[in-house]
Amino acid sequence: MLPQPQIWLCPTDRPLIPGYQALLSSEEMARGERYQRPQDKQRFLTMRLALRILLARQLDCLPQQLQFTYGPQGKPELVDRERRSPWFNVAHSGNYGLIGLSTEGEIGVDLQIMLPKPHYLKLAKRFFAPQEVQQLESLEGEKRTKLFYQLWTAKEAFLKATGKGISGGLNQVIPDENLAKYQYLPDSGDTNHWRLSSQPLLADQGSNDNYWMAIAWCTNEVNQVESNYLPNIQPFQWPRNLDSLP
């Protein structure tokens, strides 16, 4: 059985665990203070706390013992990463965040709240491949909105996994028409070793809004994941207090 990524869904509008400051670094606290809007600060602190707690559970250590370093585009990684340490990635939009962990290789997650905006085609013409623009032009209304976010999240998930961000070339990351795998990738990716899962955030997962998520992960195996594979989305469970942490 091929190891599959683990995905957690975390609401970002809930009260923070009392005493949370003890789990974060001074750099993280300072970064949180730089946000102008309270909801942005809340979102950042929530996701960084959740990430630390999940990684600490995996590595059997205290959350505050983890140290992070950052790539050229800001992608966080663990300092002195050990062989047993998972790869990870974080995304957030609206009132929700996603955390993805993988023991096989790099992983990227993206989450977007689907808001109808008039400039989708303008963005697509700038960042998407010509055939994708044609697909969008053939649709209207909700169908166009949905396809835009399906394509955008699939592209960004891969670029986040590789640590390149949007500058890595959105128009060079092309998912297949079923959003089950990648049809074409830049030089940094072999389509035979990258998996893609694209799905909505369902109402029974707690959302009253329309969200779309994508997960991209690298594997050493080839063609061993079903084309319709959807990772299990687990609700993140907050500890009741600091004393209940490992």
Swiss-Prot record:
Keyword list, A-Z: Magnesium, Metal-binding, Transferase
SUPFAM superfamilies the UniProt entry points to: 4'-phosphopantetheinyl transferase
Binding sites annotated in the UniProt record for Mg(2+): 110, 156
GO molecular function, one term: magnesium ion binding
Cellular compartments per GO CC: cytosol
Its EC number(s): 2.7.8.-
Cofactor(s) the protein needs: Mg(2+)
InterPro entries in UniProt: 4-PPantetheinyl_Trfase_dom (IPR008278), 4-PPantetheinyl_Trfase_dom_sf (IPR037143), AASDHPPT_N (IPR055066), P-Pant_transferase_sf (IPR050559), Ppantetheine-prot_Trfase_dom (IPR004568)
Any one GO BP annotation for this protein: lysine biosynthetic process via aminoadipic acid
Family to which this protein belongs: Belongs to the P-Pant transferase superfamily. Gsp/Sfp/HetI/AcpT family.
Family annotation (PANTHER family): L-AMINOADIPATE-SEMIALDEHYDE DEHYDROGENASE-PHOSPHOPANTETHEINYL TRANSFERASE (PTHR12215:SF10), PHOSPHOPANTETHEINE TRANSFERASE (PTHR12215)
Protein purpose: Probably transfers the 4'-phosphopantetheine moiety from coenzyme A (CoA) to a serine residue of a carrier protein domain.
UniProt-recorded name of the protein: Putative 4'-phosphopantetheinyl transferase slr0495
Organism: Synechocystis sp. (strain ATCC 27184 / PCC 6803 / Kazusa)
Source species taxonomy: Bacteria, Bacillati, Cyanobacteriota, Cyanophyceae, Synechococcales
